[in-house]
UniProtKB/Swiss-Prot annotation:
The keyword Transport applies. F(1)F(0) ATP synthase produces ATP from ADP in the presence of a proton or sodium gradient. F-type ATPases consist of two structural domains, F(1) containing the extramembraneous catalytic core and F(0) containing the membrane proton channel, linked together by a central stalk and a peripheral stalk. During catalysis, ATP synthesis in the catalytic domain of F(1) is coupled via a rotary mechanism of the central stalk subunits to proton translocation. This protein is part of the stalk that links CF(0) to CF(1). It either transmits conformational changes from CF(0) to CF(1) or is implicated in proton conduction. F-type ATPases have 2 components, F(1) - the catalytic core - and F(0) - the membrane proton channel. F(1) has five subunits: alpha(3), beta(3), gamma(1), delta(1), epsilon(1). CF(0) has four main subunits: a(1), b(1), b'(1) and c(10-14). The alpha and beta chains form an alternating ring which encloses part of the gamma chain. F(1) is attached to F(0) by a central stalk formed by the gamma and epsilon chains, while a peripheral stalk is formed by the delta, b and b' chains. HAMAP family: ATP_synth_delta_bact (MF_01416). This is ATP synthase subunit delta. Keywords: ATP synthesis, CF(1), Hydrogen ion transport, Ion transport, Membrane, Thylakoid, Transport. The keyword Thylakoid applies.
């Protein structure tokens, strides 16, 4: 990943500078999250965008049809530059790096929450309050994901701190305790 990071950083920094100047950093951060969701959810789209067989113009047309009206000109221009330079392979790295730089700049803490199943809005709100209390700030960006291997409960990662409130974690800890006792 260091190679992709070194490739992604200049693009992400340039996007951040442009969006700051235009006063659209927060909007673009939200758009980056949406684009990452599309990228991660659609293997066919991802494969087409990184394919060396597909011409850059065809990739740009596909991008315009998919997201052209839904993103700011700053983001769409970045996508066109990545397509022209055959750098769409680093698309997710650029988006993630932008979000990282944006959070650093805004003093926002990232909390990653994995749950065994999708959380309701009430559960998300309650969890958000707990995570904000743990972080000691209201500026927390929560990244929710579903991980059925947890069986039940959730795991919160906040910086170097990990809170494992999952059923699989409890079973693992119980197994370790039993192994020590015998």
């Amino acid at each position: 990943m260091p190679l992709l990071n070194s490739l992604a950083t200049p693009y992400a920094e340039a996007l951040l500078q442009v969006t700051e100047a235009r006063g659209e950093s927060e909007t673009v951060a939200d758009q980056c999250k949406q684009l990452l969701a599309i990228w991660n959810d659609s293997e066919d789209f991802r494969d087409a965008m990184v394919s060396p067989v597909l011409e850059p113009d065809a990739k740009k047309q596909a991008l315009k049809a998919l997201v052209g009206e839904d993103v700011t000109p700053s983001v769409f221009n970045l996508l066109k530059v990545l397509a022209d330079r055959q750098r769409l392979i680093a698309f997710d790295a650029v988006m993630l790096r932008y979000l990282e730089l944006y959070r650093e700049q805004q003093g926002i803490t990232l909390a990653q929450v994995r749950s065994a199943q999708s959380l309701t809005e009430d559960q998300q709100a309650a969890l958000s309050k707990k995570v904000q209390a743990m972080a000691g700030t209201n500026k927390v960006d929560i990244d929710l994901s579903v991980d059925p291997s947890l069986i039940g409960g959730f795991v919160v990662s906040l910086g170097s701190q990990v809170i494992d409130a999952s059923l699989s974690g409890q079973v693992r800890r119980l197994g370790l305790a039993l192994a020590k006792a015998s």
